[in-house]
Structures are given as C-alpha cells and as structure tokens.
C-alpha cells in the first residue's frame, strides 16, 4: 500500500504541470503526456517518489533530527505553516532571509529582538512608552514574527532535511542547504530543475490542494518517525 494513492493525487490535481513553453527538459522523465498546451505529470512516478521521500523523512525524524519546511509562495504558505506546526517542526513561509541557516547567529539575534519586544508588550512596558514608540515597536514585532516566527526555537545544527515547495522560488534556501550538506526534499513542477533536489516529488506546486496533500504526507512521515524515536528510547 503506497503512502499516497493515485486517486488522491488525481483529485488534488497533482498531475497538472506548467505550460509546455515553460518547462525544464530535465523534467522529461517525469512527464506522462501533453494536453492542451500543458504537461501532464506521470503520477506513477509521483507515487514512487513520494514513497521514497516519505521513508527518508521518517528516518530523519526517527534519528531525532529536525525538518525545516520552506514555502513562501502564496499557494504554499498556509500548508507549510499548518503541517510544520502539526508535526512540531520549524517553517519559513514568508521570506527566506539570506543566511537563515548559514549565518544563524545573526538570525538568532533577530529572534532575541522579537522575544524582547514581546516581553515588553507582556510586562506592561508598552503602557508607559510614548504612543509613537509603541506603534514602531509593534510594526517591528509583526515583521519579525512574520519572517522568523516559524524558526524561533530552531537549532540550526540539528536540521537533518529541508522540505521545499517550488525549488525555483526557493533557490536561496537550496543554496544554503547545499553549503551545509542538508538533503532537500521538494515538490518539483515541470518548470524546475530536479538536479537541485535530493528527493524529487514530481507534482503541481501551484494548486493549494496539491501542495497541502504532499506537505501533509511529509508531516505524517515525521510523526511516524518520532513515534519510532520514542519507542526506541
């Protein structure tokens, strides 16, 4: 029994690729046919590749390592946040800031700043500050929360894998993963370069349902792996 069925993939529209003029020839092995100027992804390959990715992610989680979910495009933001939270993992769904992993000490400083402002709000400091100052601090807090809220408890040295929606959009994240030797699992559409990714899941990265289905499966893999880790203890 495969982790994702052909029926689920079809219903979520995972098979719809990009227009034929916007394609990467390296994706040819994953393309089934062309219909009305759009490439149709070979879902038998997706089933197989999703299984491989699932087993890898499960193993990473079982070893006690963390998985970082990354997807900043509109169609991915919600699923990335929800599934990372559900599986007790970390996420980036607004903007990948340069050095998020390769220069984590600087990022850590920004997270501390966020925590500092939050503390000021909680302990009543805001009540005694000038209104203008409070507005400025609230604006800064919102921006920091948007960009860093999903990685505030991240231990960058414990990231065992990165799950990405749309490697074309997240090329900076992939670059940092490469520098640090972190394997990348990704939903790869017909306009992407599969060679950038260690575990390719060929699929539609523009449909919310398709993204949600595959992202949820990766979260399931983490939860299954973590159960194994607890049992081993």
From Swiss-Prot:
Protein name from the UniProt record = Small ribosomal subunit protein uS2
Q: Which family does it belong to?
A: Belongs to the universal ribosomal protein uS2 family.
Q: Which GO terms describe its molecular function?
A: structural constituent of ribosome
* TM regions (residue ranges): none
Swiss-Prot/TrEMBL GO biological process terms: translation
What keywords appear on the UniProt entry? Answer: Ribonucleoprotein, Ribosomal protein
Task: Name the encoding gene, please.
Answer: rpsB
Q: Which InterPro entries match?
A: Ribosomal_uS2, Ribosomal_uS2_bac/mit/plastid, Ribosomal_uS2_CS, Ribosomal_uS2_flav_dom_sf
A Pfam match is: Ribosomal_S2
GO annotations of cellular component type = cytosolic small ribosomal subunit
Q: List the PROSITE patterns.
A: RIBOSOMAL_S2_1
């Amino acid at each position: 029994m495969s982790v994702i069925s052909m029926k689920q993939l079809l219903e979520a529209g995972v098979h719809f690729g990009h227009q034929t003029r916007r394609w990467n020839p390296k994706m040819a092995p994953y393309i089934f046919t062309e219909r009305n100027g759009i490439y149709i992804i070979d879902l038998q390959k997706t089933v197989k590749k999703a299984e491989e990715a699932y087993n890898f992610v499960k193993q990473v989680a079982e070893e006690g390592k963390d998985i970082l979910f990354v997807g900043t495009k509109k169609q991915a933001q919600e699923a990335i946040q929800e599934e990372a939270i559900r599986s007790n993992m970390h996420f980036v769904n607004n903007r990948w800031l340069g050095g998020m992993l390769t220069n984590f000490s600087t990022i850590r400083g920004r997270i501390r700043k966020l925590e500092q402002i939050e503390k000021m709000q909680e302990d009543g400091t805001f009540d005694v500050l000038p209104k203008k100052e409070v507005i400025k601090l609230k604006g800064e807090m919102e921006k920091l929360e948007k960009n860093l809220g999903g990685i505030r408890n991240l231990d960058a040295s414990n990231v065992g894998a990165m799950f990405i929606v749309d490697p074309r959009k997240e090329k900076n994240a992939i670059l940092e993963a490469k520098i640090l030797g972190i394997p990348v699992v990704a939903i790869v559409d017909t306009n992407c370069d599969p060679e950038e990714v260690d575990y390719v899941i060929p699929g539609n990265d523009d449909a919310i349902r398709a993204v949600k289905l595959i992202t949820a499966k990766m979260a399931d893999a983490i939860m299954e792996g973590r159960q194994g880790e607890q049992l081993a203890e």
